[in-house]
Amino acid sequence: MAIRLYRAYSPGTRSRSSVYYTDITQQKPEKSLVFGKKACSGRNNRGIITLKGRGGAHKRKHRIIDFKRKSIATTARVATIEYDPNRNARIALLHYENGLKRYILAPRSLKVGMEVCSGPEAPIEIGNSLPLAAIPLGSTVHNIELTLGKGGQIARSAGTYAQIIAKEGDFVTLKLPSNEVRLVYKECYATLGQVGNIDAINTCLGKAGRSRWLGKRPKVRGVVKNPIDHPHGGGEGRSPIGRAKPVTPWGQPALGIKTRKKTKASGRYILRGRTK
């Protein structure tokens, strides 16, 4: 899919670029698979900000996405490819033979009218969901389970995928989008192929207003805050941070220093750390 460039009719379109929406075949979502939800704007149940820089997004309806793909031995037909305002990937509406309707992440090259299925005996085709043990070496997969039965958690963003590089015992070795090499239990499910809308990462919003439409608020540097709000704050005029190394608002090392706990239980499954 190509990138759409805009002429400089205004300062907001001078650097703007977006993807084409020609792959979308349906404008309105399936009513039985959407629900309304009030935006929390980064607040918890007590109204306290727990995630900064969120709020003010356009009102949107949430689509119920099937990340588990547990309709085994039932074939589904791709009815539509739709836009989802809650993610940068496209979603596909499946019509199963038994009458069920489900949304899934639309893989690259998935077209309306194609058939997909899930289960250990499913064929090796784009969009099918199988256990990692049943997928050949070198295959690209997405929507990968970390815990059996919990649903896909890895490689769900637009254009992402993981690659199966080894199988040994009860585990399969995956190379993740972050270049991390990790062991995953062989019975965990994954979907074949790469997530669609691969050019989403190459787009440019062009103006601050488009960030506000997405719910992204301005980010304030710590050095211009007060000492009570950030460790870098305070001082007279344009002062330095006053520390040997930069830290987060909570005093943890920032900018390149690893903060993952070395004794974390899941650390034994990571063969090589991420580089991105």
From Swiss-Prot:
UniProt-listed GO biological process terms: mitochondrial translation
Keyword Glycoprotein: no
SUPFAM superfamilies reported in the protein's UniProt record: Nucleic acid-binding proteins, Translation proteins SH3-like domain
The keyword Cell inner membrane is assigned to this record: no
Molecular function per GO: rRNA binding; structural constituent of ribosome; transferase activity
Record keywords: Chloroplast, Plastid, Ribonucleoprotein, Ribosomal protein
Alphabetized NCBIfam families for the sequence: rplB_bact
PANTHER family in UniProt: LARGE RIBOSOMAL SUBUNIT PROTEIN UL2M (PTHR13691:SF5), RIBOSOMAL PROTEIN L2 (PTHR13691)
UniProt record similarity statement: Belongs to the universal ribosomal protein uL2 family.
Protein name in the entry: Large ribosomal subunit protein uL2c
GN (gene name): rpl2
